[in-house]
């Protein structure tokens, strides 16, 4: 018996919606990353983008455990001298609440071209509504 390898044109994509209200950031991110990669499918192939679309709503209501809201640090560097920028989740949540979930999921997908392609299927919204009702997404409970 030969090992099955999925072909990109054979992959059937579905849409899923995750409600992140009062859920722990990492738990939501793990579930989203697994669906984006396609690890929940029997045809999972590591080098093929066989994942589905994921919509995360209520990203502004996601919870961080412990004192991470103030103590965790997100660092960026512009490339210029003195261009290091440090943010806490509290600052990021005030400016752009979707970014917390996007960064968490981004760290859980491969850091390659394939991972960047998989991240394009992630849609994160701060509120409870999203513009993807026409795709009839399936709700996932955590």
From Swiss-Prot:
CDD domains: Ribosomal_L13
Key word Mitochondrion present: no
Transmembrane domains' residue ranges: none
Molecular function, one GO term: structural constituent of ribosome
Biological processes, Gene Ontology terms: negative regulation of translation; translation
PROSITE patterns: RIBOSOMAL_L13
Gene Ontology cellular-component terms listed: cytosolic large ribosomal subunit
Subunit structure: Part of the 50S ribosomal subunit.
NCBIfam families the record matches: rplM_bact
Protein name: Large ribosomal subunit protein uL13
